[in-house]
Amino acid sequence: MGVISVQLVVTMVMASVIQKIIPHYSFARWLLCSGSLRWYQHPTEDELRTLAGKQQKGGKSKKDRKYNGHLENKPMTIPKDIDLQLETKCIAEVDTLALHYFPEFQWLVDFTVAATVVYLITELYFCVAEPSGEMNISVVWSLLVLAFVMKILFSLTAHYFRLEEGGERSLCITFAFFFFVKAMAILIVTENYLEFGLETGFANFSESAVQFLENQGLESQGPISKLTFKLILALLCALIGAFLTFPGLRLAQMHLDALTLNNCKVTQTLLHINFLAPLIMVLLWVKPITKDYITNPTFGKDNVPLMSEKTYDTLRLWVILLLCVLRLAMMRHHLQAYLNLAQKGVLQMKKEAGRISTVDLQKMVARVFYYLCVIALQYIAPLVMLLHTTLLLKTLGGHSWVIYSDESLPCLSNEDSSPAEVGQSQMEASQTVAQLSVALGGLRTVFSPLLFRGLLSFFTWWIAACLFSTSLFGLFYHQYLMAA
């Protein structure tokens, strides 16, 4: 019980932290209110009157019209080329109360931080204590994080479907079909080019499932066919692609604006690396381009591999984590580039002829700030998906964080051999408990690290591929189509 209680204590402490401390010391609130982000305030009607050269008059205006006893005020309009300078202000905590989706943003970020801390403590515990036959509770936390991310992305995508115009709805459906076809094409590529391990994992899953059912006295040819398995994966890929359509398109626009906003060469280089980060992740699983040149080089006389396959798998995990940290560090530049759209819209308005109502002008400026958390969610949700999918890949896939150690066995290997021993040791105490332990041990052999390694490698690669595809399309759209 002492071994099991360590993870339970960590979970209970973190749950208490989420409930008691995080509402007062929120990392999500710090990201927005640390003083590094400035938003543009919309002008008041009196300021617009003064700039337009109109004096505020008391009483009824001559332009007021009376219909059926009701007084109708015609909205005031001002010239579009008015000399308007927007005032900026640092985002304060009180300003976040008016932001749309701020509770969702705060919950996702703070819960992700808590889940990541639990994961780090649990990994340290497993490396030091090396418990056998114990479930890693950080897996549950990571799965909850992914569930919250999918819920929020679904909510944001559903918002586009509720719009009356319908352009966003058509774009989302189009990309969903595109990603479905793309996923079907990717799933037929042999593992000589894309080494996810799906084929090996599915074969191991089918054989173990048949053997498990036979041990239970049931006859079966397998739980699922390979075609059905890949069709389900393709449908999930289409759903993920639809959810990541608008985050990728928005990232492209913020990337272009952030490059214009920052003149520092180092910052611009980091912005370029951040934009190309999904492509780097995608190439890490393309065997002829990366892995073959490192683990089986063809140049030189000796053909000595630079590293083993296990070391390469570990290095791949570290590269993804570093790119996720870079994306989080570049978040402030992207959000500030988005907030500058208010000033950009006013400058564009000044180039146009005609008049605009004061209400429309105020809405145009205020809308940018009020939807800041929507943009922040579109930026950070894919990052959280990549991060915790990678963490699950390490834990459930049986990888290691140690690059130089090729002989160390992952903790999951010890777990696979322990359930039967635990069940046998308790057979004298309770026959029912023994049978349950054997059944759970059989399920662990069915859902083996090979299966999780293939699935999670594929989904990690797919999330990165969707992000790069949509952001590349957004870059082409904003750079060329909008300019034309």
From Swiss-Prot:
It is a multi-pass membrane protein. It is found in: Cell membrane. Essential for maintaining normal cardiac rhythm in the developing heart and for neonatal survival. Inhibits potassium and calcium currents in the cardiomyocytes, this assists in timely action potential repolarization and thereby maintains normal cardiac rhythm. The chain crosses the membrane at residues 108-128, 137-157, 170-190, 229-249, 266-286, 368-388, 456-476. One of its GO terms (biological process) is regulation of cardiac muscle contraction by calcium ion signaling. Keywords: Cell membrane, Glycoprotein, Membrane, Transmembrane, Transmembrane helix. Pfam families: Tmemb_161AB. Its main location: membrane. Belongs to the TMEM161 family. Glycans are attached at residues 136, 204. GO terms for cellular component: plasma membrane. Disruption phenotype: Mutants display highly specific cardiac arrhythmia and die by 15 days post-fertilization (dpf). Exhibit skipped ventricular beats, irregular beats and slower heart rate but their hearts are morphologically indistinguishable from wild-type counterparts. Increased potassium and calcium currents observed in isolated cardiomyocytes. This is Transmembrane protein 161B.
